[in-house]
UniProtKB/Swiss-Prot annotation:
Keyword flag RNA-binding: yes
Primary gene name: rplY
Residues that span the membrane, as ranges: none
Natural source organism: Vibrio vulnificus (strain CMCP6)
Full protein name: Large ribosomal subunit protein bL25
One Gene Ontology cellular component: cytosolic large ribosomal subunit
Family per similarity comment: Belongs to the bacterial ribosomal protein bL25 family.
């Protein structure tokens, strides 16, 4: 599986809310020797694939033209809506 991710320049609660209203959600890619990277992902693309078992294995994020192999580490969901609020990915 391969997903496009955009590096976030604005961080914080307000920026995250604007992302969610635009149909995206914030995420963090960390682990390995590289520094953590804050990214934004398309909500519908991710949610449609989350039901598949392959999603929780190795997936590829394309961040600024560079492919990064990651694995979902943590998913924060909305309390009663079928929405993802935030995700953490760990580099493989």
């Amino acid at each position: 599986m391969k997903f496009e991710a955009v590096v976030r320049t604005e961080l914080g609660k307000g920026a995250s809310r604007r992302l969610r209203l635009a149909g995206q959600f914030p995420a963090v890619v960390y682990g390995g020797e590289a520094a953590p990277v804050a990214v934004a992902l398309n909500h519908d693309d991710i949610v449609n694939q989350m039901d598949k078992p392959e999603f929780y294995e190795a997936i590829t994020l394309v961040i600024g033209g560079e492919e990064v192999k990651v694995k979902p580490q943590d998913v924060q969901r909305h309390a009663f809506k079928p929405k993802v609020e935030h995700m953490d990915f760990i580099r493989i």
